[in-house]
A protein has these predicted regions:
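Glycosyltransferase specificity loop/lid
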Residues: 2-417
Length: 417
């Protein structure tokens, strides 16, 4: 049985680590300006936006949030002139162009190396312009916080003389796994990638098997999307190594976890990296932060949940990216029918199968295209979460106290232990 946990972010360490504030208090000078830059995926935007809003509310600093124009348009589709900046009274949102402003990009429609090369080139140029514009307008950025797949941000920050810090939006255990992979374990793991039960013992981490590792580390296709993303991770860790060598001190990394859960993992790389666990926001706060790339379903799913008994509903969602095969959909439909439990199932419009039509019409179930996951998990009627076990979903279900049936191996292992 999960309990609701909230551990407040260590804001004082973050502000001091950016070499901005000399104050010993939590409050930052209003002239302190943080720029959050994130990759245009829902799973990246959510934790970055949560932390950005927490920075703004707890430190008094100025905060700007930036992602690509395409994602920005979808976040603010109901506003006029959605390509322009937007201020919600707390944060200013300013987009940058990645060269694909008018396209609903999917990695299946373009060679991954070609896409990331285009993304890097255009984004570097336009983020640099954004930084110049902010400085010219009297709002110079004092620190940049960036998420995964954006290693090029460090170059831009350096050119402008601005300190930058990585916000690792996954688990500390996953960070430790990647760290050790790039520091002596790559050949071993690659050599045994086809042996799921092969034991892997990273320094300071609990024993693992190949099956527990992120799939990016065990995929053997040299030119696929996994290899391209792994190259981006490799660059991130090279940057951290470079910071350590140049400054003769440990680089700082913000990690989306809390000390009490991942004490062992955080200690496993503490000699090389100063990890600052920024915790997870309470459901009351997370509920109020919206930056959705998808339009919320018009079905009144919250009202539907209100009609169900406490802890009776099975909530099913596999994230905003995954696409299920017909056979997988059939298995889930069969399981739902046999469970005789009310269910709320999130299925993308372009992933619907004919089998769903029958089950969607039943009184005990509802199928939606998109919903506010935190609102659903916080509802008294939800008793179980069937999930792909992305880190955001893992933390949200933990905070809301909802048990879950999980998929991603390493996150699932963390939940079990």
């Amino acid at each position: 049985m999960f309990v609701s946990i909230y551990l407040p972010p260590r804001m004082d360490r973050i502000i001091h680590s950016s070499s901005i504030s000399s104050s010993s208090t939590m409050a930052a000078n209003p002239q302190t300006h943080f720029l959050f830059i994130t990759y245009p995926m829902q799973s990246h935007i959510n934790p970055a936006l949560h932390l950005a809003k927490h920075f703004a509310t707890t430190t008094g600093a100025t905060v700007t949030f930036s992602t690509t124009i395409f994602a920005h348009r979808r976040m603010f589709s109901s506003t006029t002139n959605s390509d322009k900046g937007f201020n919600d009274g707390l944060i200013t949102y300013l987009p940058f162009s990645d060269g694909l402003d008018g396209e609903d990009y999917k990695l299946t429609t373009m060679d991954s190396k070609e896409y990331f090369s285009l993304f890097r080139t255009n984004s570097k140029r336009n983020v640099s312009i954004l930084l110049n514009d902010l400085a010219t307008s009297g709002r110079p950025v004092k620190c940049i916080v960036y998420t995964l797949l954006l290693d090029w941000v460090v170059d831009i920050a350096g050119e402008h003389g601005i300190p930058s810090v990585l916000y690792w939006i996954q688990a500390a255990t996953v960070f430790g796994t990647y760290y050790h992979f790039f520091h002596g374990f790559e050949c071993l793991i690659k050599a045994h990638a086809d042996d799921p039960s092969f034991p892997v013992c990273f320094p300071g981490l609990p024993p693992l098997q190949i099956r527990d590792l992120p799939s990016f580390l065990t995929d053997t296709e040299a030119d696929g999307i996994y290899a391209t993303i792994l190259d981006s991770f490799r660059e991130l860790f090279k940057i951290l190594d470079g910071k350590q060598e140049k400054k003769m001190k440990k680089p700082k990394v913000l990690i989306n976890t809390f000390q009490e859960w991942e004490t062992v993992a955080l200690a496993s790389f503490s000699n090389e990296v100063e990890a600052i666990p920024v915790g997870h926001l309470p459901k009351e706060y997370t509920n109020s932060v919206a930056g959705y790339l998808f339009r919320e379903d018009e079905k009144k799913y919250m009202e539907w949940l209100d009609t169900k008994e406490e802890g009776s509903v099975v909530y099913i969602s596999f994230g905003s990216v995954s696409m299920m095969k017909k056979e997988q959909m059939e298995e889930i439909v069969k399981a739902l029918k046999e469970s005789k439990r009310p269910y709320l199932w999130v299925v993308r419009k372009d992933n619907r199968e004919e089998e769903l039509l029958e089950i969607e019409e039943g009184e005990d179930g509802m199928v939606v295209e998109w919903c506010s996951q935190v609102k659903v998990l916080a509802h008294r009627a939800v008793g179980c979460f069937v999930t792909h076990c992305g880190w955001n979903s893992t933390l949200e279900s933990l905070v809301c106290g909802v048990p879950h049936w999980t998929d991603q191996a390493m996150n699932a292992k963390l939940v079990e232990t």
